[in-house]
Amino acid sequence: MTRGSDRPRLYVRFAESDPAAAEQRLAQMSAHKAHLRNEDGVPEGFRILASGPMQAESGGSAAALIIAEARCIEDVMAFSDADPFVIHGVYNRIRILSWTPTLSRISGLQGD
């Protein structure tokens, strides 16, 4: 996908939590949530469709998932890089991938 494409695509950010960063998670939680909800200053065509933590069997947060619509992966990467959880090392691994749903029962997401 090239920068500036007219047609938004879907992207998934999968961020694995660093168990040693529990204090930073707590300290940055409000700023992280504000970042996810803030629509000011995001690139045109960028919007979060769904987000939330993924729980480990032990009950702690193991990872977090964001499904976003954007015109290019660079916009998703820039949004992710500005996330307080990313800035303060709450995640130890982040993957951002283009996603093409082939089956969806989520309202508004259509499969190819």
List each model region and its residues.
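Conserved, structured core segments of small domains
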Residues: 1-112
